[in-house]
Amino acid sequence: MSDSMLYQTLQTCLPKSRLITLWLAFTLAMLIQEPRRHAATVNAATAGGSMLGDVNISAILDSFSVSYDKRVRPNYGGPPVEVGVTMYVLSISSLSEVKMDFTLDFYFRQFWTDPRLAYRKRPGVETLSVGSEFIKNIWVPDTFFVNEKQSYFHIATTSNEFIRVHHSGSITRSIRLTITASCPMNLQYFPMDRQLCHIEIESFGYTMRDIRYKWNEGPNSVGVSSEVSLPQFKVLGHRQRAVEISLTTGNYSRLACEIQFVRSMGYYLIQIYIPSGLIVVISWVSFWLNRNATPARVALGVTTVLTMTTLMSSTNAALPKISYVKSIDVYLGTCFVMVFASLLEYATVGYMAKRIQMRKQRFMTIQKMAEQKKQQQLDGVQPPPNPNPNTMVDHGGHGHGHGHHSHGHPHVPKQTVSNRPIGFQTMQQQNIGGRGCSIVGPLFQEVRFKVHDPKAHSKGGTLENTVNGGRGGPPVGPHGPGPQGPPGGPPAGGGGGGAPPEGGDAEAAVPAHLLHPGKVKKDINKLLGITPSDIDKYSRIVFPVCFVCFNLMYWIIYLHVSDVVADDLVLLGEEK
């Protein structure tokens, strides 16, 4: 119904005033509804255009599935597919010497061309970015990590993967992975070592006739975040290479990304090197302690040895059981030898002191008995024959007849007398070189004066000076036998007041240490020419000097040998 007809109908049915009111209300309502209808028309037109765009993109994606077989690689039967690879390392979480592996989180991107996915270029749709669901509908390289031990694909909050399809058919696939890969390590210079760990990329089934891998951006294909850090290591740099691997099933293309790590020395200096060095220094304290303080020195030596043993055990417990020697083993082993040598040094000092003390006691006993014997002779009392095989030997001064003028004598060596079962006769006093020496007892006895340790015999020293008597035989000195007397008679040299033997033979009849007691006094406190105190004095200098020299050689050699940088390494922070 038109507006004029509606107006005529209302005019016939309603009064004129009311008719005008209704007409104005109707006109006003039409004016209000006009903008709304215009907006609805505009929205409808816009919606129609957007829908057209959706239809075009969907049509492109749907067209990929027409006569497309994802089981067949691109250019099947033709040239191999070139797959470009790039990596960007986000973080490296661990590097284990025990497990020989390392864990890293990185973006892994692959680039290849599939002509079957090319489409006509349209404005605004040169590249299509689609979700990970689309990957199930197309062919993708069967890439895997050769030295992978464990991998993790991130799915929070959605699958961390996307696909980009270029209108020319170029495909870009990007995923985020966390991989634990094996890393064989050489711990010969541990803890000053540098390790080179790598990730190897290869096709699992396609040989080089089907797929060839390459670094897509040349030397800049691998990137490492500057925020990568490890507690015990620093990332020195990385390098990349492409190789061809020959297996029984054919030749395969392989890419390798190598990352070099430098171990930080701070932990090992604080926890191992400095404590072990201080333990060695503590072991030197025993050199300044009195050698008679046996409990203190033994306790100190044993404690340092056990502490070094514990430190070595705890250090090696955190490392793999390897057969070769590490640099830290050299240091700890040397420290252990040093503290053990300190303990043996006190054992040597104690042994020498004991031997010297025993010699002093024997000398004092012999000297005391000799003085008693001389006193009896001065009193005119002739001692009865000694039933013991051991007899006493006296050192007298100038004497005449059987009388002696005793002089104080130092310690004399050990004397041993052995009997010879042939009669008895008393030796007379002999004045030799102005000194009197009387040996009272059976003449058929052998008197031995033990001066030095038996080991001195190997050095040409005099072990024993022997005065032999028997059958009138002369005393035997260091120069050979003296004059012989008749059997059963008095010894050569006369009776009670006879003259002594002349010349060198007279002095040879008596041991030299009896003629020169001062020399005996000088050497009685030494063993092998040194005293126990000398050993402590020498040790106070020798041990520190040896340890300082060892440290200088150790740190200079190992720091120089271990400072090796891999060839063609791109240092961290120098990537272009």
From Swiss-Prot:
Could you state one GO biological process linked to this protein? gamma-aminobutyric acid signaling pathway
Q: Which UniProt keywords apply?
A: Cell membrane, Chloride, Chloride channel, Disulfide bond, Glycoprotein, Ion channel, Ion transport, Ligand-gated ion channel, Membrane, Postsynaptic cell membrane, Receptor, Signal, Synapse, Transmembrane, Transmembrane helix, Transport
Q: What else is known?
A: Flies carrying the Rdl-S mutation are resistant to dieldrin.
Q: Where is the composition biased (Pro residues)?
A: 475-490
Mind naming one GO cellular-component term on file for this protein? synaptic vesicle membrane
GO terms (molecular function) for this protein are: benzodiazepine receptor activity; chloride channel activity; extracellular ligand-gated monoatomic ion channel activity; GABA-A receptor activity; ligand-gated monoatomic anion channel activity
Q: List the disulfide bonds.
A: C183-C197
Q: Report biased composition (Basic residues) as residue ranges.
A: 398-412
On the Cytoplasmic side, which residues? 351-540
- Functional note: GABA, an inhibitory neurotransmitter, mediates neuronal inhibition by binding to the GABA receptor and opening an integral chloride channel.
The listed locations are:
Postsynaptic cell membrane; Cell membrane
Glycosylation, residue list:
N56, N251
One Pfam family name is Neur_chan_memb
Which region ranges are annotated with the description Disordered?
Answer: 372-418, 452-507
**Family that this chain belongs to:** Belongs to the ligand-gated ion channel (TC 1.A.9) family. Gamma-aminobutyric acid receptor (TC 1.A.9.5) subfamily.
Q: What is this protein called?
A: Gamma-aminobutyric acid receptor subunit beta
In terms of superkingdom, the source organism counts as Eukaryota
* Subunit note: Homomultimer.
Residues annotated as transmembrane: 269-289, 298-320, 330-350, 541-561
